Amino acid sequence: MELNNLKPAEGSKHAKRRVGRGIGSGLGKTAGRGHKGQKSRSGGFHKVGFEGGQMPLQRRLPKRGFTSLTKEFVGEVRLSDLEKLPVDEIDLLALKQAGLIGEMITSAKIIKTGELKRKVVVKGLGATKGARAAIEAAGGSFAE
């Protein structure tokens, strides 16, 4: 086998459709566009969503909802994530610097997933009942 003998598999390649090249090709004269009408003309097509003058679906349906400007972005942090943190005082800034929550987050809540075996002081963060109990059981505390 040499490079000059390589051929693609039978039927894997298709010849490009050459339209408007005589009646013998089967795609001559009107080139598969039919007779007359907007879609047969060059440059003749409608914009996306145009329904022939009928009120389009996007305008028939009512507008709904709005974007709240006062929306709070609340992040969730697992106990197992707190275990990996190198600091003992945990607040929103420490979580952001560790990359556990995004920059847009304005408040965070600790959830009881995983285990916490070391003593930590949590400042200004919320926690579920189970997470609070687990932190206090490990000798940690909450400073509001």
UniProtKB/Swiss-Prot annotation:
GO molecular function terms noted in the UniProt entry: rRNA binding; structural constituent of ribosome
Keywords linked to the UniProt accession: Ribonucleoprotein, Ribosomal protein, RNA-binding, rRNA-binding
The UniProt record lists the keyword Ribosomal protein: yes
UniProt cross-references to InterPro entries, sorted A to Z: Ribosomal_uL15 (IPR030878), Ribosomal_uL15/eL18 (IPR021131), Ribosomal_uL15/eL18_sf (IPR036227), Ribosomal_uL15_bac-type (IPR005749)
Classification via Pfam families: Ribosomal_L27A
Signal peptide coordinates: none
Stretches for region Disordered: 1-57
Superkingdom: Bacteria
SUPFAM superfamilies per record: Ribosomal proteins L15p and L18e
Compositionally biased region (Gly residues): 21-31
GO CC field: cytosolic large ribosomal subunit
Biological processes, Gene Ontology terms: translation
Family designation: Belongs to the universal ribosomal protein uL15 family.
Stated role: Binds to the 23S rRNA.
Subunit structure: Part of the 50S ribosomal subunit.
The protein, known as: Large ribosomal subunit protein uL15
Organism: Paraburkholderia phytofirmans (strain DSM 17436 / LMG 22146 / PsJN)
Designated gene of the protein: rplO
